[in-house]
């Protein structure tokens, strides 16, 4: 109950944004480690640049990104579900901290990398060791990071 209240402000923003961009109801996703509501962004809204965004316990994602059984889709879903855990820990502090971390990450790493890479790679809230998943801008699980068995256990915990 306390966790639900702690994440409520951001989750309400996520549900409101999800209803606006999806035009319909969400579906439940996740597993034992984290659960969320998934809203699929309607095409034609000019949001094609958005991969997936997690706001509290609501995930907004472009069509097809988190569907399917391929490894990248499953790891991306698990990555977004890991953000719900970060919301559990940080509550209403998550959004301002994430925005500050994104801005600092971009400022510290200007030059040499695409913008999307800059704002994700150096942001501690996007780091693999915190999100325990794949970067949205790189191949999932670089060589040696995790064995196949570890990947399967991780995906099972997140219901992906």
Where does each model-flagged region fall?
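Catalytic Zn2+-binding segment of zinc metalloproteases
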Residues: 81-99
């Amino acid at each position: 109950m306390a966790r639900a209240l702690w994440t409520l402000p951001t989750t309400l923003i996520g549900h409101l944004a999800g209803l606006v961009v999806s035009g319909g109801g969400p579906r439940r996703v996740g597993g034992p480690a984290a659960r969320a509501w998934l809203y699929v962004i309607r095409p034609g809204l000019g949001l094609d640049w958005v991969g997936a965004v997690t706001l509290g316990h609501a995930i907004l994602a472009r069509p097809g990104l988190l569907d399917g059984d391929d490894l990248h889709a499953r790891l991306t879903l698990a990555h977004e579900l890991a953000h719900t855990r970060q919301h559990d820990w940080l509550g209403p502090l998550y959004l301002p901290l994430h925005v500050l971390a994104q801005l600092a990450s971009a400022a510290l790493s200007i030059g040499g990398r695409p913008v999307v890479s800059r704002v994700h790679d150096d942001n501690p809230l996007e780091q693999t060791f915190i999100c325990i998943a794949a970067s949205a801008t790189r191949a999932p699980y670089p060589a040696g990071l995790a064995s196949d068995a570890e990947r399967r256990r991780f995906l099972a915990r997140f219901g992906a």
